[in-house]
C-alpha cells in the first residue's frame, strides 16, 4: 500500500459572499471590527470587480489540480490535499486537524505565494507546525519560496512576451514593464527579510528571459496603517516613469500573486489604469497564472523537489 502524504496548500483566503466581508476584515485586523467607513470602502472595491473575488474558486481549483497532477506523475506515494486559509475557513489549523484525523504523518506545506517573507510564508507555515506539534505524530515540511523555479519564471516570460509581441516596434521602444508584489511594512527590511530582494531578482529573471530592456520594480496594495510601507507604489511609479522617461505603454506583472483577485482586478486593472488614462498611456496586464496547466506543472515540480529533500 502506498504511503499517504499530506499536501497542505495554504493561501490568504477571501470572502465567499458579501456577508462574509465584515468577519473576514475583522480577522485580518486581529479581532478588531472595521469602522463602518472602512467596511464600506472594502465592500465597494469588491462590488467594483463584480461583487466578490474569484479567488476562492481559483485557489480551490489550483489545489485540486495540483493534487491530481502529483498523483499522475509519480506512483511512489499518494498525495492527499488539504486547503488551509489564513483569514477565513477552512483555517490553516482546521486543515492540520483534518490531516491528523486522517492518520497523515508527513505533509508538504505549500503557500500560494512565490516569495518568502516573515509576514506571509513564515507565519502560514508557523501556524501549521504549531498545530501539528500540539496534535503530535504529524510533521509539516514547509516550502520557503519558489520564485526561482524555472517554470514559474517561464510562465511570466511567456506572458510578458505575449504582450510585447502584439506591439509595434515604435510602441515597444516607449514601453516599460512594472514587476510588482504586495507591499509590506518597511520594518521588515531592518529585520533582514529577503522579500524585497527576491522580488528584484524575479524582475531581473523575467526581463532577461523576455528580452525587455525597460523595467522597474514596484509595490502595491499597501495596508492602511501608520507604519511606512515599502515603496515605490505602482501608481506613483507609473507617473514617475512617464515624467522622467516618457514611457507611453505600461505592462504590469503582479508576480507576487498567483491568481486574479481584488489586488489585481482592482489595484491594477482599476487603480493603475486610472493613472495610465490620466497620463494618456496604454495599460497592459498579462493573464495571471490561475489554474493553468503551465502553472500547475510549476507547483508540481516545487512539491516533488521538497519531497525528495525531506522524505
From Swiss-Prot:
Alphabetically ordered keywords of this record: Cytoplasm, Heme biosynthesis, Iron, Lyase, Metal-binding, Porphyrin biosynthesis
Annotated binding of Fe-coproporphyrin III, by residue: 12, 29, 45-46, 53, 124
InterPro entries, per the entry: Ferrochelatase, Ferrochelatase_AS, Ferrochelatase_C, Ferrochelatase_N
An example Gene Ontology molecular-function term: ferrochelatase activity
CDD domains: Ferrochelatase_C, Ferrochelatase_N
Reaction(s) the record says it catalyses: Fe-coproporphyrin III + 2 H(+) = coproporphyrin III + Fe(2+)
Protein name: Coproporphyrin III ferrochelatase 1
Pathway membership: Porphyrin-containing compound metabolism; protoheme biosynthesis
Cellular localization per UniProt: Cytoplasm
Pfam (any one): Ferrochelatase
Chief subcellular location: cytoplasm
One GO cellular component term noted in the UniProt record for this chain: cytoplasm
Enzyme Commission code(s) on record: 4.99.1.9
Residues at which Fe(2+) binds: 182, 263
Protein family: Belongs to the ferrochelatase family.
Gene: cpfC1
GO biological process, any: heme biosynthetic process
Superkingdom field: Bacteria
NCBIfam families: hemH, PRK12435.1
Role, per record: Involved in coproporphyrin-dependent heme b biosynthesis. Catalyzes the insertion of ferrous iron into coproporphyrin III to form Fe-coproporphyrin III.
Source organism (scientific name): Bacillus cereus (strain ATCC 10987 / NRS 248)
Amino acid at each position: 500500500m502506498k504511503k499517504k502524504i499530506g499536501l497542505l496548500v495554504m493561501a490568504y483566503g477571501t470572502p465567499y459572499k458579501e456577508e462574509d466581508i465584515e468577519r473576514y476584515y475583522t480577522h485580518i485586523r486581529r479581532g478588531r471590527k472595521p469602522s463602518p467607513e472602512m467596511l464600506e470602502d472594502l465592500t465597494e472595491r469588491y462590488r467594483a470587480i463584480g461583487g466578490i473575488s474569484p479567488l476562492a474558486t481559483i485557489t480551490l481549483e489550483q489545489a485540486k489540480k495540483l493534487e491530481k497532477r502529483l498523483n499522475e506523475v509519480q506512483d511512489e506515494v499518494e498525495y492527499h490535499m488539504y486547503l488551509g486559509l489564513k483569514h477565513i475557513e477552512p483555517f490553516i489549523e482546521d486543515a492540520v486537524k483534518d490531516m491528523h484525523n486522517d492518520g497523515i504523518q508527513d505533509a508538504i506545506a505549500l503557500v500560494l505565494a512565490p516569495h518568502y517573507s516573515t509576514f506571509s510564508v513564515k507565519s502560514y507555515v508557523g501556524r501549521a507546525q504549531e498545530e501539528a506539534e500540539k496534535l503530535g505524530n504529524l510533521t509539516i515540511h514547509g516550502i520557503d519560496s519558489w520564485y526561482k523555479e524555472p517554470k514559474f519564471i517561464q510562465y511570466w516570460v511567456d506572458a510578458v512576451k505575449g504582450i510585447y509581441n502584439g506591439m509595434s516596434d515604435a510602441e515597444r521602444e516607449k514601453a516599460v514593464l512594472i514587476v510588482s508584489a504586495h507591499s509590506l511594512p518597511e520594518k521588515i527590511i531592518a529585520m533582514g527579510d529577503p522579500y524585497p530582494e527576491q522580488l528584484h531578482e524575479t524582475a531581473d529573471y523575467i526581463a532577461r528571459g523576455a528580452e525587455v530592456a525597460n523595467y522597474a520594480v514596484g509595490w502595491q496594495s499597501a495596508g492602511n496603517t501608520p507604519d511606512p510601507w515599502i515603496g515605490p507604489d505602482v501608481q506613483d511609479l507609473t507617473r514617475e516613469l512617464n515624467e522622467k522617461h516618457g514611457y507611453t505603454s505600461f505592462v504590469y506583472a503582479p508576480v507576487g500573486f498567483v491568481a486574479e483577485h481584488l489586488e489585481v482586478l482592482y489595484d491594477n486593472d482599476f487603480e493603475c489604469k486610472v493613472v495610465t488614462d490620466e497620463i494618456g498611456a496604454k495599460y497592459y496586464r498579462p493573464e495571471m497564472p490561475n489554474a493553468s496547466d503551465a502553472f500547475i506543472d510549476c507547483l508540481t515540480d516545487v512539491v516533488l523537489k521538497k519531497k525528495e529533500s525531506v522524505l
